[in-house]
Regions:
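Multi-pass membrane proteins that catalyze or facilitate reactions on polyprenyl-/lipid-phosphate substrates
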Residues: 1-285
Length: 285
C-alpha cells in the first residue's frame, strides 16, 4: 500500500489548518491518518511526508510575514553591531525591529531546550491516543483561561518585556506534547501577558518559524529514500499545506481581532473527549 494523492491533499489541508489555528496539528496528524486509513510505503516515506508538510507551513508563514522577517534580519545585524558601538540597550529601547528580534530569540530558547532534552521521551506519546485526547483537553483549558481571565491587553512591541517573551516561550515548549497546540499555547500566554490580541497572534506565528524549521531539520536525517516513493502525493500534500497554511494565518489574524477564541476551546474539548472515549472503548487506555 501507499499514500494516495487524495489522502496527501487531505493531510496537507489538515496540517495547514491546524498548524496555525489553535487546535494542535500534532494531534490531528495522529488522528486523521487513522480515520482515512493512510498507509505509507515505508517508514522513510512517512518521515519525508511529515517533513514536507512542515516545510509547507514554514513557507506559508515566511510568505505571509516576509516584510517582518526582513526587518527582523536587519534588526539582528544592526543590534549585533550596536554591541560593539556600546548602544545595544539603547537600540532595544528605541528600535521596535531590534526589540522584536531579541524577543523572538528569548522566546525560542525554551522550545529548543525542550526539543533537545525531552523529544525522545515525548515521541512515544504520539502512539498514545489517550494522551493525545488528554492534551487536547488541556489546550482547550488554556484557551478558555486566556479569554476568560484576560482576553489580551494593550501591550505593543515597545512595552513587551523579555520576561513576557520567556513565559510565552515556556508555553511553546509544552507543545512538544501531542495535543498541546503550539499556536494555542503561545497565543494564550501572550493574551495572559497583556499583549494586544493581534500582537499575541503575530508574535506566535513569527515564533513558529525557528521551531518548525528546527523540527524539519531534525527529521531530515531520517528521510532516507522516502522522497522516492509516490513523489506526486508528497508534492500534493506539500502544496496543500502551503496554500491552506497561508490562508489560515490570514483567517486567525482576522478572527482574533474581531472574535473570541472560545470556539477553538470548545472544539478541542469535543475532539479531546471523543478521543478519550474511543480510546477507552477500544481498550487503548
Amino acid at each position: 500500500m501507499d499514500i494516495t494523492i487524495i489522502q496527501a491533499i487531505i493531510l496537507g489541508i489538515v496540517q495547514g489548518l491546524t498548524e496555525f489555528l489553535p487546535v494542535s496539528s500534532s494531534a490531528h496528524l495522529v488522528l486523521v491518518p487513522q480515520l482515512i486509513n493512510v498507509n505509507y510505503a515505508n517508514p522513510s516515506q512517512a518521515v519525508a511526508f511529515d517533513t514536507l508538510l512542515h516545510l509547507g507551513t514554514l513557507l506559508a508563514v515566511i510568505a505571509y510575514f516576509w516584510k517582518d522577517i526582513i526587518h527582523i534580519i536587519k534588526g539582528l545585524i544592526s543590534s549585533i553591531l550596536d554591541i560593539f558601538r556600546g548602544k545595544f540597550i539603547t537600540g532595544l529601547k528605541e528600535d521596535p525591529s531590534k526589540r522584536l528580534t531579541w524577543l523572538l530569540v528569548i522566546g525560542t530558547i525554551p522550545a529548543a531546550v525542550a526539543g533537545v532534552l525531552l523529544n525522545d521521551q515525548f515521541e512515544a506519546l504520539f502512539n498514545n491516543y489517550a494522551a493525545v485526547g488528554f492534551f487536547l483537553l488541556i489546550t482547550g483549558v488554556l484557551l478558555w483561561i486566556s479569554e476568560r481571565m484576560k482576553g489580551g491587553g494593550d501591550k505593543k512591541i515597545k512595552n513587551m518585556t523579555f520576561k513576557n517573551a520567556l513565559v510565552i516561550g515556556i508555553f511553546q515548549a509544552f507543545a512538544i506534547a501531542p495535543g498541546i497546540s503550539r499556536s494555542g499555547s503561545t497565543i494564550a500566554a501572550g493574551l495572559l501577558s497583556g499583549l494586544e490580541r493581534e500582537l499575541a497572534a503575530r508574535y506566535s506565528f513569527l515564533l513558529a518559524i525557528p521551531v518548525i524549521a528546527g523540527a524539519a531539520l531534525v527529521q531530515v536525517k531520517d528521510i532516507g529514500t522516502g522522497l522516492e516513493a509516490n513523489t506526486a502525493a508528497l508534492v500534493a500534500g506539500f502544496l496543500a499545506a502551503l496554500i491552506v497554511g497561508f490562508l489560515s494565518i490570514k483567517l486567525l489574524l482576522k478572527l482574533i481581532k474581531e472574535r473570541s477564541l472560545m470556539i477553538f476551546a470548545y472544539y478541542c474539548w469535543i475532539i479531546g473527549a471523543a478521543t478519550l472515549i474511543v480510546s477507552y472503548m477500544y481498550g487503548l487506555i
